[in-house]
Structure formats: structure tokens, C-alpha cells
Design a protein with these regions (language model features):
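Alpha-helical transmembrane segments of integral membrane proteins
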Residues: 2-4, 13-16, 89-130, 144, ...
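Hydrophobic alpha-helical transmembrane segments of membrane transport/permease proteins
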Residues: 15-66, 159-180
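Membrane-water interface segments at the C-terminal ends of transmembrane alpha-helices
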Residues: 22-29, 59, 70, 134-165, ...
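Hydrophobic aliphatic residues
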Residues: 26, 30, 38, 42-43, ...
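Alpha-helical transmembrane segments and their lipid-water interface positions
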Residues: 35, 74, 147-148, 183, ...
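Short, hydrophobic secondary-structure boundary micro-motifs
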Residues: 36-39, 63, 78-81, 147-148, ...
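An internal, D/E-rich "acidic patch" concept
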Residues: 58-114
Length: 315
């Protein structure tokens, strides 16, 4: 088990290094000059070059990458070109919106998908199965930004149950803050819940055809007990894998959803930084998101042995 953990940690470290190179290279390839955007198009060439020197943009590419990557290791993300404040301060302000949003969406998608998958698998081929999987297919097909707009119209404009957008801050109280995150979380969660429900159904159907399930039924165990105690636990490996991947999709989806709902989170910060060519903000925030995704997937890998003890010996 120790060898397995060490191997996974090494793979995670290599992945982080490669991801940092890709992120840095992509941002360098994108058109636009941050110094020119900051000074305006009426600025002279000398003024632009002076600012580029001050910002370190004229240094060799390799040196700039090493300086940036070294700063990441020491949690020194540099200063924003646009806001003229440390990037870490911007992250602290925005992560208190994005992280709860992603966690609420993940909890919602799991709470919806697992019961739907159980229901559908236990009624394979029947009308309930067809209806549930049809709804799941629709959930996968509908774009989350369109679904978000429909939620705003229904619950904010028509029923007036929740705010249409914005975030009051946690200082306004837990319920007002959570209330403002409900619609965005539902918009993020539904497509992921649809995917997870289909995966859970497939895994459960495969497990329900195993010999030990038939043996448990033959011994007289109630079908519900067999389904929840035996089948679900053994079907959790693919479900956990998808959950780890979904966390990445949820973080990426916040870029769209936070702009639809006008939430001051990391997604909106990245979007604004891209339009303003604030390279240091984009690179640093994207790498933080990459690190978060890798950490979550490491936890998923480690949880396999907890869910299925048979894997401990193999690992």
C-alpha cells in the first residue's frame, strides 16, 4: 500500500509540473500585450517597453517560467497587472464563493444520481428505468448556461423565491449566502447528476448479476437490503472515479455559471483576467484549480481501498 501511495504522489507531482508548462505556454501564445492594454493604445512604444521591463515581460521565456513556478511553490503568486494587488489576495476573496458553490453542486449531483441509479437498475427494462434514463439523457444534452437562464426565469423572476444573481457575502449570514448559491449549484449539478446516474445504473446492473447477489437473494435477504448493503458498495468504484472527474468539470463550469449569475468567484476572476490579459492571475488561478483537481483524484484513488478492501492487497 505504501508503494502504491508513493507512486500516486510521484505521478501527481509530475502531472503538476507538466500542467504548469502547458498553462504557461498557452498564455504566452495568446495574442495581446498586457502592457499595451494597461497603458491604452495611445501610449507610445517607449512607454510600453518601459512597463514591459518593469513587469519582467522582456525577460527570456525560460527565466519567466522558472520565476513564476518558483513563486507558486512558495505561495507567492505575484501581483495582478490589472488590480495591482497580490494574486493570493484575489484568490482568498473569490475562493469563499467558488469552493462552496462546487461542493454544494457536488453534493446535489450525488444526492440525485445515486437514488436515480438505484431506482433505474432495480427496474431494468421497465417503464421507470426508461423514464429515468430518458431524463438523464436530457440532462446531459441541455447546456448548463441555458438551464441556468431557465432557473433564473422560473425561481427568481416568476416565483421570486431566490435572488437572480449576485452574492451578499458570508457576513450577511449563512442562509442569505447559501440562498444566492442555490440556483447556480443546481445549474452546475444537473448535467453531472445525469452522467453519474447513468454510470451508477450500469455499475449496479453489472453487480446485480454477480453470483454472490443471487446467493444473498436465495438466502432470503430482502431485495432492498441486498441493493443497499451489498450491491451499492461494490458498485462504488466507477462511481467514485466519475465523482473525481466531475469535481474538475464543476470547477471549470463555474467560469460560465459565475458569469451568468454574476458571482464574484474564481471563475469570474479568470474570465475577467483573460479579457484583460492579466497573465499572472490566469496562470496562477488555473494552476490552483489543477492542483485541487489532482488532490481530489488522489483522495478518490486512496478511497478505493476503503470502499473495496480486496484492493488493498493488490495495491
Amino acid at each position: 500500500m505504501t508503494t502504491y501511495l508513493l507512486k500516486r504522489l510521484i505521478i501527481a507531482a509530475v502531472t503538476l509540473v507538466l500542467a504548469s508548462m502547458v498553462v504557461f505556454a498557452v498564455m504566452e501564445i495568446l495574442p495581446g500585450d498586457p502592457a499595451r492594454l494597461m497603458l491604452g493604445f495611445n501610449a507610445s512604444t517607449d512607454q510600453v517597453e518601459l512597463l514591459r521591463n518593469q513587469m519582467g515581460l522582456n525577460a527570456p521565456l525560460v527565466l519567466r517560467y522558472l520565476h513564476w513556478a518558483g513563486g507558486l511553490l512558495s505561495l507567492d503568486f505575484g501581483r495582478s497587472y490589472t488590480y495591482s494587488v497580490p494574486v493570493i489576495d484575489l484568490v482568498r476573496e473569490r475562493v469563499v464563493v467558488s469552493l462552496p458553490l462546487a461542493l454544494i453542486a457536488l453534493a446535489l449531483s450525488t444526492a440525485i444520481a445515486i437514488p436515480v441509479g438505484l431506482f433505474s437498475a432495480s427496474r431494468q427494462g421497465r417503464a421507470g428505468d426508461t423514464l429515468a434514463m430518458g431524463a438523464a439523457q436530457l440532462g446531459v444534452a441541455v447546456p448548463n448556461f441555458w438551464f441556468a437562464l431557465m432557473l433564473i426565469y422560473l425561481f427568481a423572476v416568476w416565483l421570486r423565491l431566490v435572488p437572480a444573481g449576485g452574492f451578499p457575502g458570508w457576513s450577511a449570514g449563512i442562509w442569505p449566502a447559501v440562498k444566492s448559491l442555490l440556483l447556480p449549484a443546481v445549474a452546475l449539478a444537473m448535467p453531472q447528476a445525469a452522467i453519474l446516474a447513468r454510470v451508477a445504473r450500469s455499475a449496479l446492473i453489472e453487480v446485480l448479476n454477480e453470483d454472490y447477489i443471487r446467493t444473498a437473494r436465495a438466502k432470503g435477504l430482502p431485495y432492498r437490503a441486498v441493493l443497499w448493503r451489498h450491491a451499492l458498495r461494490n458498485a462504488m468504484i466507477p462511481v467514485l472515479t466519475i465523482l473525481g472527474l466531475q469535481f474538475a468539470f464543476l470547477l471549470a463550469g463555474t467560469i460560465i455559471i459565475e458569469n451568468v449569475f454574476y458571482l464574484p468567484g474564481l471563475g469570474r476572476l479568470v474570465f475577467q483576467a483573460i479579457t484583460q490579459r492579466d497573465l499572472i492571475v490566469v496562470e496562477s488561478v488555473v494552476m490552483l484549480l489543477v492542483a485541487a483537481v489532482i488532490a481530489v483524484n488522489l483522495l478518490v484513488d486512496f478511497s478505493y481501498a476503503v470502499v473495496d478492501p480486496r484492493l488493498r492487497g493488490r495495491q
